Amino acid sequence: NGYKEDFYLADNQPDSAFLDKLPFEHYVVVRPENIKASYVEGRQSIVPELLKELDAAGYNILFLPRYESDRDYAQGIKNIYMPKEAVNGLDACYYADAILTGAGTMAREAACLGVPSVSFFAGAHLLSVDQSLVDAGKMFFSRDVAQIMQYLEHAKDSFFEYRAGGIAGLERCKQVQQEILDVLEQQIRAYLKSQN
């Protein structure tokens, strides 16, 4: 009753010093879609418009460009931080107020942690695992910036609820991991018993 991300998130120990590396305590993460991928035919990135709207609404943005050229999207944006070095993506998810990404893994990680998660995946179809998270209400999907901003406004209340009890997402991941380990142990025991 979980996702592959639950299994490895269960063992993650968030770095309590992560926020010390950022210029702000509250932020949303923006990770561009992979416009250069073969499964994306002729689509334009929504990130330039999304960054402008987030900036206008007063959000602090941790921007994680995929390509060097993605850095151009940040020109003129005031409340944005682009790390010079790679950051721990799991810590970025754990401490974020929301994740907005064109990448599936980060959106799923956030959803599993209980962090408001927005996917603006640019492919023709969502992966079935992402669609199941959307159907369960754990992830929001849209490539329409106005819809994304509206979702964020409605999700704002949960930003602070999550921060107050953020460990709940990790506890759920640990429960999923334990269920998997229990099933594996049962299967191994049954196999070993059949070999005697």
Task: Annotate each predicted stretch with a short phrase.
Residues 1-43:
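A nucleotide-sugar donor-handling region in carbohydrate enzymes
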Residues 1-3, 73-86, 135-139:
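Active-site regions of enzymes building and remodeling cell-envelope glycoconjugates
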Residues 2-5, 85-89, 122-127, 145-146:
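Short, acidic/turn-prone active-site loops that include or flank metal/cofactor-
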Residues 6, 11-12, 43-44, 67-68, ...:
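Conserved mixed alpha/beta catalytic, RNA-binding, or beta-rich assembly cores of soluble enzyme
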Residues 51-83:
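Catalytic donor nucleotide-activated moiety binding site of glycosyltransferases and closely related
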Residues 92-129:
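A donor-sugar binding/catalytic signature common to diverse glycosyltransferases
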Residues 158-196:
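C-terminal amphipathic helix plus adjacent low-complexity
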